[in-house]
């Protein structure tokens, strides 16, 4: 039988929950319009677990660009237009820059050290200061030297690729790039332990972040229960210990390296005084953990777009060939700046299939008013990037893949990296990766459907897998064929001529930072 203390605790939890529910009912205010709620549960019964983009899209069409929902004790605001997102999340960022409380993935499995989930405050500002120091445009320009080398290897690796392993080779590129910067070591093969282990940890993190997986996220007061009544605590602690052990291993090896890397950069005189050892490991680690998967997903979406839209590929190839002389040389970062259709292809890929359809939710730090509606304190605010990208009022024929729209109207909005103070800190390096990899792959390869037993393997452009806030193409097959023997020869010589010694590569980057 349960002890009197446990019974008392459960009674307190129940009473507190009912009290909070009562207060939320009597203090409703005038929320933005939305589907009619039911007593107590609000709109929980209507909130989609699958096909979320379609349901949200219908709500915006019915109720407008800002939709209000009640999810039990919580209020959720869906923002479906760039204008509203910029007003609330950008211009009013001082009060819209926090995050909803996430007990399992944030507080337990990461001990409050995951930057993306942190509430706005001194701790997040510390993380953001370090990330900005490493990812500002000046620093990122130095990283192009490494991106040049890694993308040469990717283009070369795909010469021997199959119709189904291009994703693994892309993942190697994005993982090796960030791992070399963070810890001073490149990852030459896609089966490297560091890549596989990080993928496992990232997968566990995303699973724990999924809405509805853990009751404690819906009712945080349950976290006051003792461990034997709260099995999620043990699970979360085991996940954290596995992750932190990996970070310690990476850090120890990085500090032994003779040359510059992010870890060494912030473990010397530049170490923030207020950052503990554990926190600093997490600050660096999250850049590798988050950046590898997001860049991979975006580039896989690019391959899908290239297979499905050969006319757009032929046009961009003609532009590249005219500048670099066909197969004479591989395009460079300097060339990318002179290739407007390449830039348009990148923008259209990010719009056509956004990898974070709803972004990472924001949380309101104090009550606000907008267009006569009340947005209560602690409301969850979701920037519905999918709806924004598919809004015919902004993008003519939004379902079509049309890179030329960005040449016809260069002022079209982009939201792929989020809004306001919580915009992706790695957006500059990610965009550089997108541009150089797409440009070089379009120069080097023709993209086609795979064929099996003489039959074309179809690709469903809507078959994407949701993992937490991320969306990536479900596994698909594609044939990447080198455009000519001359292209293949140039690809091979480009890799041969590039520096392969990681210490020399990082020393070159560091020399420009002095």
UniProtKB/Swiss-Prot annotation:
Q: Which gene encodes it?
A: aneD
- In short, the EC number is 1.-.-.-
EC top class named in words: oxidoreductase
Q: Which reaction does it catalyse?
A: asperaculane D + reduced [NADPH--hemoprotein reductase] + O2 = asperaculane E + oxidized [NADPH--hemoprotein reductase] + H2O + H(+)
**Protein known as:** Cytochrome P450 monooxygenase aneD
Q: Which residues are glycosylated?
A: 113, 261, 347
Q: Which residues form a coiled coil?
A: none
Cofactor(s) listed: heme
What effect does gene inactivation have here? Abolishes the formation of aculene A and accumulates asperculane C as a major product and 14-prolyl asperculane C as a minor product.
Q: Which organism is it from?
A: Aspergillus aculeatus (strain ATCC 16872 / CBS 172.66 / WB 5094)
InterPro entries from the entry? Cyt_P450 (IPR001128), Cyt_P450_CS (IPR017972), Cyt_P450_E_grp-I (IPR002401), Cyt_P450_sf (IPR036396), Cytochrome_P450_fung (IPR050364)
What's in the keyword line of the UniProt record? Answer: Glycoprotein, Heme, Iron, Membrane, Metal-binding, Monooxygenase, Oxidoreductase, Transmembrane, Transmembrane helix
Q: Which GO terms describe its cellular component?
A: membrane
Location in the cell: Membrane
**UniProt pathway:** Secondary metabolite biosynthesis
Name the Pfam families for this protein.
p450
Q: So what family is this one in?
A: Belongs to the cytochrome P450 family.
Membrane-traversing stretches: 6-26
Q: What's a single GO MF annotation on this record?
A: iron ion binding
What this chain does, per the record? Cytochrome P450 monooxygenase; part of the gene cluster that mediates the biosynthesis of aculenes, a unique type of norsesquiterpenes that contain a nordaucane skeleton linked to an L-proline moiety and are of mixed biosynthetic origin. The pathway begins with the synthesis of dauca-4,7-diene by the terpene cyclase aneC using farnesyl pyrophosphate (FPP) as substrate.
């Amino acid at each position: 039988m349960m002890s009197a203390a446990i019974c008392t605790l459960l009674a307190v939890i129940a009473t507190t929950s009912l009290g909070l529910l009562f207060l939320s009912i009597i203090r409703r205010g005038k929320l933005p319009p939305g589907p009619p709620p039911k007593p107590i549960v609000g709109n929980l019964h209507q909130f989609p677990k699958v096909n979320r983009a379609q349901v949200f899209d219908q709500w915006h069409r019915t109720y407008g660009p800002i939709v209000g929902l009640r999810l039990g004790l919580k209020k959720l605001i869906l923002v479906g237009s760039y204008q509203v997102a910029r007003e609330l999340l950008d211009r009013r960022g001082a009060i819209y820059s926090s995050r909803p409380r996430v007990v399992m993935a944030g507080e337990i499995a990461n001990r409050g050290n995951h930057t993306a989930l942190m509430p706005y405050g001194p701790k997040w500002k510390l993380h953001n200061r370090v990330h900005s120091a490493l990812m500002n445009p000046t620093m990122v320009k130095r990283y192009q030297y490494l991106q040049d080398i890694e993308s040469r290897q990717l283009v070369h690796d795909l010469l021997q690729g199959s119709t189904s392993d291009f994703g693994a080779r892309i993942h190697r590129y994005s993982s090796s790039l960030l791992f070399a910067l963070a810890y001073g070591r490149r990852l030459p093969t896609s089966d490297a332990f560091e890549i596989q282990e990080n993928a496992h940890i990232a997968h566990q993190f995303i699973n724990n972040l999924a809405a509805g997986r853990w009751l404690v996220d819906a009712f945080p007061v349950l976290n006051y229960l003792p461990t034997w009544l709260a099995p999620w605590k043990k699970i979360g602690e085991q996940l954290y210990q596995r992750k932190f052990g990996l970070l310690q291993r990476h850090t120890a090896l990085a500090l032994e390296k003779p040359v510059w890397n992010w870890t060494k950069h912030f473990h010397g005189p530049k170490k923030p005084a207020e950052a503990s050892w554990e926190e600093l490991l997490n600050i660096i680690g999250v850049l590798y953990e988050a950046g590898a998967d997001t860049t991979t997903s975006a580039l896989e979406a690019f391959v899908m777009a290239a297979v499905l839209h050969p006319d757009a590929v032929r046009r961009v190839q003609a532009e590249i060939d005219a500048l670099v002389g066909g197969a004479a040389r591989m395009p460079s970062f300097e060339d990318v700046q002179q290739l407007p259709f390449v830039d348009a292809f990148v923008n259209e890929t990010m719009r056509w299939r956004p990898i974070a359809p709803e972004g990472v939710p924001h949380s309101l730090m104090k009550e606000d008013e907008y267009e006569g509606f009340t947005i209560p304190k602690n409301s969850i605010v979701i920037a519905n990037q999918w709806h924004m990208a598919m809004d015919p009022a902004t993008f003519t024929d939004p379902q079509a893949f049309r890179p030329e729209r960005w040449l016809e109207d260069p002022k079209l909005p982009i939201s792929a990296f989020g809004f306001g103070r919580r915009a992706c800190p790695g957006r500059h390096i990610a965009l550089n990766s997108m541009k150089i990899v797409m440009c070089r792959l379009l120069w080097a390869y023709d993209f086609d459907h795979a064929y099996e037993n003489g039959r074309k393997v179809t690709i469903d452009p809507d078959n994407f897998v949701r993992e937490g806030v991320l969306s990536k193409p479900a596994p698909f097959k594609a044939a990447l064929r080198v455009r000519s023997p001359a292209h293949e020869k140039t690809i091979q010589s480009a890799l041969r001529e590039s520096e392969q010694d990681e210490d020399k590569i990082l020393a070159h980057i560091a020399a420009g930072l002095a």
